[in-house]
Structures are given as structure tokens and as C-alpha cells.
Amino acid sequence: MSEAMDQPAGGPGNPRPGEGDDGSMEPGTCQELLHRLRELEAENSALAQANENQRETYERCLDEVANHVVQALLNQKDLREECIKLKKRVFDLERQNQMLSALFQQKLQLTTGSLPQIPLTPLQPPSEPPASPSLSSTEGPAAPLPLGHCAGQREVCWEQQLRPGGPGPPAAPPPALDALSPFLRKKAQILEVLRALEETDPLLLCSPATPWRPPGQGPGSPEPINGELCGPPQPEPSPWAPCLLLGPGNLGGLLHWERLLGGLGGEEDTGRPWGPSRGPPQAQGTSSGPNCAPGSSSSSSSDEAGDPNEAPSPDTLLGALARRQLNLGQLLEDTESYLQAFLAGAAGPLNGDHPGPGQSSSPDQAPPQLSKSKGLPKSAWGGGTPEAHRPGFGATSEGQGPLPFLSMFMGAGDAPLGSRPGHPHSSSQVKSKLQIGPPSPGEAQGPLLPSPARGLKFLKLPPTSEKSPSPGGPQLSPQLPRNSRIPCRNSGSDGSPSPLLARRGLGGGELSPEGAQGLPTSPSPCYTTPDSTQLRPPQSALSTTLSPGPVVSPCYENILDLSRSTFRGPSPEPPPSPLQVPTYPQLTLEVPQAPEVLRSPGVPPSPCLPESYPYGSPQEKSLDKAGSESPHPGRRTPGNSSKKPSQGSGRRPGDPGSTPLRDRLAALGKLKTGPEGALGSEKNGVPARPGTEKTRGPGKSGESAGDMVPSIHRPLEQLEAKGGIRGAVALGTNSLKQQEPGLMGDPGARVYSSHSMGARVDLEPVSPRSCLTKVELAKSRLAGALCPQVPRTPAKVPTSAPSLGKPNKSPHSSPTKLPSKSPTKVVPRPGAPLVTKESPKPDKGKGPPWADCGSTTAQSTPLVPGPTDPSQGPEGLAPHSAIEEKVMKGIEENVLRLQGQERAPGAEVKHRNTSSIASWFGLKKSKLPALNRRTEATKNKEGAGGGSPLRREVKMEARKLEAESLNISKLMAKAEDLRRALEEEKAYLSSRARPRPGGPAPGPNTGLGQVQGQLAGMYQGADTFMQQLLNRVDGKELPSKSWREPKPEYGDFQPVSSDPKSPWPACGPRNGLVGPLQGCGKPPGKPSSEPGRREEMPSEDSLAEPVPTSHFTACGSLTRTLDSGIGTFPPPDHGSSGTPSKNLPKTKPPRLDPPPGVPPARPPPLTKVPRRAHTLEREVPGIEELLVSGRHPSMPAFPALLPAAPGHRGHETCPDDPCEDPGPTPPVQLAKNWTFPNTRAAGSSSDPLMCPPRQLEGLPRTPMALPVDRKRSQEPSRPSPTPQGPPFGGSRTPSTSDMAEEGRVASGGPPGLETSESLSDSLYDSLSSCGSQG
């Protein structure tokens, strides 16, 4: 308008001057100009108005978008919290169910004499149904009726499935489930699983599996099976398999099948029809068995032995039970021999059996089974596949007697079931399983079902082939057991069979037969990622026994468990275990542990248990491995793969996922080690592992789902391992198996030791897993996925939260440790939340979690290299399957995230949600907590390993982007500045305070006062610390170099660290653990990480750096808490080990280097240098002081670290008792550094708990002195530094003390209390600190 005005003015002016010339024109021109002016003004005003309107609209849109985003984030957060609550509830329920089942099973075992009778009754009824075996539907209905006794719902399902003709209905029901919304379907599956568990408990109590097996194993059974193998009887075996599955997993399995299949029943029905005479009875038996253990037992007996066998079944059952329990070890050995023999001669059959003519039944079965797997169980069941398998099992049974029977029961029945339920139900069951962690795999399974079915068939068919090829029971018998054995190992191989295998693994002898079947099938499905996922989810589902499809698998697991239980005693427990595990992996783990203990009572089964473990563990691993590997790996694994499966198992804990996974993995590791060591079923245990490992690597995507499944299995197995070989087996199984069967004994000790610590046990196993598990390394990379096993463990925290999550975390900080914890103590539920918290972090970035996993794997690998803690290493490895770890990591991270939120729902959550960095002040992120969280999750993904710190930074950056888009950028910048200022201030204060603790031991540092004497020297470096803080704040100077230097060591140490993380979660997280590592690596790294990660890293640095890396990862939350104490947001990934490199871009380079070793955790500290600065300073003085202290002369130099590492590593690697020497090297450095810083930090908050332990130097290894504990525990080499060890511990604890300042006190206490609790507390504290900082 001004222009227009000017123009008019100018116009008139011009005309005016020229008025004289153009007087006449002036009026017209002026009017014209005025008119134009008005027009321009009107136009301008209109444009201005339009502009304003547009601006308002735009702003409104922005506001709406921002609101929507925030709302969505908040809703997501709420949903997460709700999911966590539900998971917890499920976990509690599952644990209750499992405990009840275990008790019931124990009672049943006590009344074993009556057991055969019970099965007898069912046997006869199944017998009658067999009378009308021709009528598949008739038989189906009959079966449903028995089922109906115990489970009306099942009856309905069975009837539906059976009546439809099996194939159609089964397929239809899964679609129906599919049709349901995933949420509803999950709910339905969960309800089904819960009901199944309820029903299963009684069935399990009946522990018909044992009787069934004996009858099946009875001489009659093999013949009928063989005879049937050739003809209609073959179908019988198939139905028998369901029965068998139901027998051991009995109700759980049946329910799962039925449930999963609303049409699994169809499958099962088909199965029954398969063996018209025997199949129906078996189906019925299954029906009955699940519902009525006796029915199941008799059914299996009847099916397997046929009517003729039916009569002897009872006697055979009782005899077999007694024999099995007494001779389970021998049977397993025999099975092993068979497997070996068949491996040599039947390897081909296994791989090519299904195709081979010998497999005529098998091929027949294969197509049918494929069909079945695809969703037409009837054709599959009807086909000879199940029968073939059964015959094979029957042969096994014949050859080996009760064990073969078990094998047949487990293998034949289970394998087919696993195959068809796994696949047909896979979708449903997998979904169920997925409910817990890998829904997507489950879903994929539905589509992949055909493939997986085929894979399963292949896996199973080969076993079937083997079985059918040797219609003359003997060959089949050996082959079946062998298959079973391999499958056990391969259990992990195939998702669907895998669950079966897992169950079989639990079942021991059964494991092997099924393993044979499952193996071929497992590997095939696992090979294909989809298949792998599918199969794995089935396994998960099986474990869950929620999903219809996987139900079979769970059934298998249950059966295996039952079988194991039968062998071991609490067969009922296993089924719940699978159920619980699937429902809540952690729960399963936890429950399984208790059940395992219960099972443990059944020592006769104990031999079976150990072998079962190997099977279960291998199975778990096989799941992972087989998926990757193929039938071959599974088959191969029997002998050679045995170690690999172990690794797979070790890796497993890393699996997502699920924390329970971790827990399970830990359990698996334990189981494996236990079984292997106890039974010397190294082959069995080991074979599966190779498969698992392979599977893990190849089927990462499957692994994610599969990991969870294995985890689930593992928990079951772990339970058993824990029960029977609770100490050695539980912990050592996985890792030991992986590293060396010999370690089993050590793991046993370790397990017990850990068990004493509670979470520690698992932690250690997890740690070993971490170390050994490549997956773990991978998980490290996958940061969120599994590396934050500890964090992710939290996802499964309920069950294996502490153990699973943390062990996972080992590399990732949380997952490894948690798994360890959970297995160690079912208690870790408090810890579980911790795990959950941690889990969520890793979970945040599931993709990254995978990356984290990778990172963890890398770290793990170093850990493996540093088998200082062989047990730990192997175990860590076993639990952390690459995929499993990833999956577990993701899940656990998610859970962790959710739990973290739950834990510090108020400010903590908010702070955490609000950008980890900027909003930990509670400043900028309060608006978008969900967004922040999501960013964090993204960050986690980005820095899977470094996760937290990196995640924070990434998150911050992402959030900043979002904020900018949402006009929050300014707020974010302010928050960042504030955060930095706070960090610096806190760093200063912390450094001063920590030094103070050294001297005066002020307030928070009062605890440090305990370590004052030791800290005094360290605190001499207080100035140095301050300087370092300043340096870090200013520029994160030297850390990069030093960091890297230590990192290589850490790389060496990292694996250990990873493990240690798990072991030291309490300590490491407490700032103390990381301290040592940090001391050496952190000072250099801190500066670099200082800016971005400073706040995150400081704590991670100080907390997670040293051993803590693994340890820290295990207790990433603690680390964060510690950091947060310093002013670091809890989220810096404790999974630093894995994620640290990713944690902070700045520190990333250094961190990346560090990830190889504990340093990964350390890198986060670098990132958080500002916050950590004080810690770093502490650390630096600590390093100098440590050197001065003489903790280890080498401590000062990073290279020295290596020399010092031996001793320090031992300290640092406390978790890795065996690996003390290797692990300690990096830890030494860490320890040195940490001694100083941690002493301060720990002194304050952790000191009370840690200090004494530290001073104890003892390996109290109690959860109490997490860092110290670890170190003390590590203790042999620790002893000399013990004095310093305590300071060391103190050092680490000091880090904690930082956290303590912010509420880490609880954490500090928890370290002593429980690894899991420590983790939880530290996580919580870290969140709180975040809030307080804000």
C-alpha cells in the first residue's frame, strides 16, 4: 500500500509540476492514480488478509500435527505401559501356573505308580477311539471329548478342528484367528494359553508324558509304530505325536494346538485321523492327555503301541517311567549313540530321507505334513509325516525303550505336531508367541506356513524318513533318537519344530527323536528367514502354547518339559513353562526356574534333564541355528554342532526379546551346560547349538522371532537346568556348552554362585553368552534388539527380566544381564522391571537392536576371545543367539523402555521421554514425552549398542528436528544448553563430591566415605578429575585415543565385559563398574563423548565402561542411573557395550572402537563426558591412583590395561569367573580407572552395599556388590586388588554414587541386593536423576 500511496503522491506531484503544461490532464491522471491506489490498497489488504488467514491455518495445522504427534506418542507410551503391565500380569500368572504345574507334577511324580493307571484309563479310551481310527472325524470327536474333560474350550477347538476333517478346520481356525485383529487374536491366544496352562497344570500334574512315553517306548509301541509306519498305523504315530506332545506338554501342548489351531485340532484331528486306529486314539489321547494326563499317556501309549501295545502300555509306562527316570541318562546316551550312528548313516536320510523312498511314508507324510504345516494338518497328519515320524520314534522307542518312546513320543508326536501345529498353527501360535515378542514373525509364519511347513516337513520328514526308512524299528529307533538329539540341538533350528525341539530338548530323550524330526524341519524353516521366523515363532508360540500354530511347538516344549519332567519329575511344569515362557518369556524363565527346581527333585529324570537340557538348549539354539542352518546343521549338530548350538544357545539370550528370551537363553545356557555336563550329552547339547548359532546368524529376522522362542524354550530348559542342574547346568549349560562342555561343571558352580547372588547366576551365564554369542555382538550392534539384552531383558523382565535382560545387556548392558538374572532368580521381577526398562531401550530400535546385537556380537566375540569367564562366555553366547539376542534385545528394550517409564512414570518417564539429553532436565521434552521416547527408541536403534548415550544424542537430534518442526527447536536448544550446563555443574560437583567422599565423604558420598581411604588416593586426582571434567566438557580431548586403546582391550574384554555387564549389572551400573574401564578408556574417551554423550556417557563411561560394559550393559539402567546421578540421563545405553559406540556420535568413533570391549560402555561415558567428566576425572585420578594404589601397575596405561587386565579383568570380569584372566585385562583398566572414580561414586551410593563387598573383595558376587561383586567374585585375581577392589568396587560404585546422588542409592543398595533389582533400581534412579536434573 505504501507503494501505491507513494505512487499516487508521486503521480499527482508530477502532474502538478506539469500542471501548467498539462492542466487538463491533471484531474484525469489524479483520479486515475487515486483509483489505482485504491485498487492496490484493496488488493494489498486482501493479500494481507489471505496471508494472515493462511498463516493462521498453517499454525493451526502445525499445532494439530504437533498435538497429534504428541497424542500419538502419549498413547503409544500409555499402550506400552499397559502392555508392560499386562506382560507383568501374564508373567505373574504364568509363573503361578508354572509353579502350580511344577507342584502338581511333583505330586504326580510322587504318584508315578498311579500315573500309569491314569494313562491306562485314557489309553483304553484312546484304544476305543482307535477302534474307529478309520473315522478321522469320529476319532477327532473322541479325542475332543477326552480333551473336553479337562478343557472344554479345547474340546471345542479340537472338535472344530477334528470335525472339519482336521485340515480344513485347522486351517480355517487359524485364519479366523488371523481375521481377528492382532490385538484380539493375541488376547484370545493369551486367554487360551492361560486356560491351557490352567488345564495343563493338572495334566502336567498327571505328567502323563512320562507314562505315555514309557508305553510308547514299550516294546509294543515300536512295533506298532513301525508297522503303522508302513501303513495306517503310521498315521497312528502321528496322532500319537500329538498325544505325546500333549503327554509331556500334554495339556499345554494339546491346548496350544487346539487353541492355536482353533483348527490345530484339525491338524491334531488330522493327526488322529492319520493314524485312524492309532492316530485317533493318539489325538484323543492328546486331547485327553492334555486334558487328562492319563488319557494323554494312554493315548500315546495306545497310539504308539497300538491296541496291542495299549495293554502293555500301562506296565510299560510305569516301567518306562521308572526305567526312564533311572535309565534316562543311559537312554540319552543310547540315543546319543543312535544319533551318532544315524548321523553317520542317517545323516543322508535325515537330509534326504523325506525325499528318499525309504521315506515313502515320510514323503507321504512330508507332503501331508507340509500340507499340515501349511494349514492342512489333516493331509499332513493324515499323511505319514507324523506317522512316519512316529514310526521313527516308535523305532527309536523300540530301539531305546522308554527313552525311544519318549523320543517317539516327543519326536514323533511332537515333530509332526510341531510341524503341523508349528506351521498350521504357526500363524496362530506364532502369533501367540509373537504376542509376546515376534508377532510379525508369527504373522509371517502364517504366510510362510507353507514354506515353514515344508521346512518343518523337511526337518521332520527327514526324521520321519529316518523313521520310515527304518520301518524295522531298530534303524528308526536309533535314527529317531539321533534325530531327536540333533533336533534338540536343532530345536532352535526350526521355529516350529524348534519349539517342539525345545520341548523335546526339555524332554531329553524325547527331545532327540523329535530333534531328529524337528531338526530337518527346523533347519529348513529356519533357513528361510521367514521360515525361521515362522518356525521360531512357532517355537515361541509353542512355548507360549498360546498360539494355535505354535501351540504344537509349545506342546512339544511342554512335552519335552513333561518328558523332562517325567525324566526329571515335574513334567507338568514344563508345559506351563512353555506356556508361560511364550506368554511371558521372562515369566517362563522365572517360573521355569522354580519348576526346574521342582523338576530337579526328579533326579532320576535329572540325567534326562541334563540331556534334555542339551536338547532343550540345543533345541533352543537349534531353533536359532536350525533356522539358519538347515536340516543338515541340525543333523550335523548332533555331534559336531554341539558346541555351535551351545553358542547358539548362548546367543539366544540376546534374543529379544525377549527378556524372557534372555532369561530363557540363560536358562538354556544353564540347561545346556547342565545337561551336557551332567549327562555328558555334550553332543546333544552341542549339536543343537551349532544349529542354533547358524540359525541365528542366517535367520536373523527369524531369529528375532526365533530368538524369543528359543528364549522361551531356554527358560523352560533353564528351569529344568536350574531345577536339576540348577547351578552348573542352569548357568553353565548354555555358555559352557558353547565354550566347552567341561565348563559345565564350572558353570554349575558359577550358577550356584550366581544363584546365591540371585540375578548374578543368570548374569554370569548371560555374560558368557554375551561373550560367546556372536549374536550378542550382533546384538550389540543391534543395540536395541538384543545387545541391550539387559535393557531388553526388561521386556521379559517379568520372567527373565533380570537374568535375561541383563545378560543380554551384557553386550547391550541390559539383556545379557537380565537373562542371567532372571534365570538366577525368579525373583528379579523387581529386577524384571529393571530388565524391562533396559529392554525397552534396546527395544526402542529393534532394527538397531539387531545392529546392537551385532555390536554385542562383536563384543561378545571378544568376550569369547576372552573366555576368562568361559562359563560366562559360553553361556552368554548360548543365550545370545544373533537373532534371539536381537529379538530379545528389541523386546527387552521395548519392555525396558516401557518399564523404565513405568518405573519413573512421573518425572522419570517424562525426562526420559523428553529428549534424553535435552529433556532429562524435564525441560524441553515434557511436551512430547512419547516423542522423546520414540526418538530415544530410534536412537536406541541407531546406537543399538551405545544405545542410550548415542540414542540420547540421536534422539536429541531427532527430537530437535521434530521440535523444530514443532517449534520446539528453541526449547530443545535451551534444554540442551541447560543440560550441558547442568552436566558440567554436575560433573564438577560430582568430581568434587566424589573426591570429597574420598576425603570427607560428603552426603551422597557418605557411602564413598567407606572407601574414603582408598578413594583418598583416588581423590587426590580429584583435581585431575575436575580438569578432566573440564576437558571433557570443553572438548572431550584425549579420551578418543585412550578410549580406543582400551577398546581393543575391551574388545577383548568387551565380551567379558558384556558378560561382566551381566554379572556386574549391579556393580557396573553403579558407576563403579564402568569406572574402572572408564578410568582407563574413559578419560580419553570422555572428552570426545563429552558434548553430546557427556551426560549420557559420563555415567555410562564411569558405570558401564569397565567391565560394566558388559556388566554395565547388563545394568545399563544402572549405568544410566549413575550417569543420571552425575546428571546423565538413565537412558544412556547401559548396553553401552553394544550400543556405546552408537550411543553418541561424538563418542561414536571412540565408542565404536570400544564396543569390541567393555569400552563400548565406556564410549557412552565419553559421550557423557560432561556429566561423566567428574566421573572421568575421578576415573583419571583413579587410573593414576589405581596405578599408585598399585591395583595393577599396568592400570595406568591402556596397554598396561592388558597386563593389568588379567587381574583386573578378573575383577572387572568378575562375572566371568573362569575368564578372570582374559576378561580382567580390559576390566583391569576399567577397574583401575573405576577404582578411583567408582570409589568416589560408589562410595556414596553403592558404597554401603558395594563397599563391603568390595572390601570383602569376596566374591560375594552377591548381587549386592554388583561391580565390586563382580570384581570380588572375580576375585582370585581380585584379591590382591581387593583392598583396591573395594575401592575399585567403590570406584564403580562411585559412579553409582553419582547415581546414588540422584536416587542411585537404591541402585547402590540393589547392587548388593540383586542384579536384577540393581538394574531396576539403577534404571529407575537414572530416570529419577533425569527428572531431578530437569
UniProtKB/Swiss-Prot annotation:
Gene Ontology BP terms: microtubule bundle formation; microtubule depolymerization
Cellular location(s): Cytoplasm, Cytoskeleton, Microtubule organizing center, Centrosome
Residues forming coiled coils: 28-106, 956-994
Motif (S/T)X(I/L)P motif 3, residue range(s) on this chain: 926-929
Keywords: Coiled coil, Cytoplasm, Cytoskeleton, Microtubule, Phosphoprotein
Modified residues (Phosphothreonine): 659
Biased composition (Basic and acidic residues): 933-942, 1033-1050
Region (Mediates interaction with beta-tubulin and is required for microtubule bundle formation): 750-1146
PTM info: CDK1/Cyclin B-dependent phosphorylation mediates its dissociation from centrosomes during mitosis.
PANTHER family, per database record: NCK-ASSOCIATED PROTEIN 5, NCK-ASSOCIATED PROTEIN 5-LIKE
Protein's recorded name: Nck-associated protein 5-like
